[in-house]
């Protein structure tokens, strides 16, 4: 009977006592901005920052504790810029950008998460669930030609907000052998209230290969969706951000 009992996750080839990921996420980025007045709730226009590819730096650290539990830390940053011609007037934070003029936009986002994990599994498979918290910061700046007193002039508007939110994670890891593994991971952040609210979903699947015992590579494909609501005293902004693409990591395990 003892020979048939499942192993603790800590005995699994799918997990490491210490695991480090350093790399980048080559993401196709789409940013949609919906501006409106705060009271009454009236739309003042929508604009899509031109879609493009961006490299998102990313770092992770996994620590296994007591064989069946662990800590996970994740941090990444995104910077997306575009220049486009407005097809219709667009008012953002009170700045009335004119149609048929150039609009320059820059969106920056950074997120850091920490989660406590519980792992279950056997010699080759590990299933995990985690709870934790996330800190994220978003910046948006728009520059272009605005209409003021029947005259045109250069103008810009920007905001910079941050927030803390709860985090939920799930994961499955499978080891084909000691040097080749497959994994699927997902996480969700939800935040209501405050100047910057919204939610973030992140999912990814990848393969790890260790030609040396402690050093290897990981390649994955991921998709991230952010919906952020920025509430100001007079004007609000809703942002819908979509990222998807491959990632490559240098892997270190101990």
Located regions from the model:
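Glycine/small-residue-rich hydrophobic helix-like segments
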Residues: 194-230
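Transmembrane beta-barrel strands of outer-membrane/channel proteins
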Residues: 22-26, 73-77, 129-135, 172, ...
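Transmembrane beta-barrel architecture of outer membranes
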Residues: 56, 163-169, 198-206, 216, ...
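Extracellular/periplasm-exposed beta-strand and loop segments of Gram-negative cell-envelope proteins
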Residues: 30-56, 77-110, 136-163, 191-195, ...
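Repeated loop/turn-to-beta-strand initiation elements of outer-membrane beta-barrel proteins
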Residues: 68-71, 124-127, 178-182, 213-217
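Residues on the lipid-exposed face of transmembrane beta-strands in outer-membrane beta-barrel proteins
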Residues: 22, 59-63, 114-118, 131-133, ...
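N-terminal signal peptide c-region/cleavage motif recognized by signal peptidases
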Residues: 4-9
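Short glycine/proline- and aromatic-enriched beta-strand/turn motifs that initiate or cap beta-hairpins
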Residues: 10-80, 247, 251-253
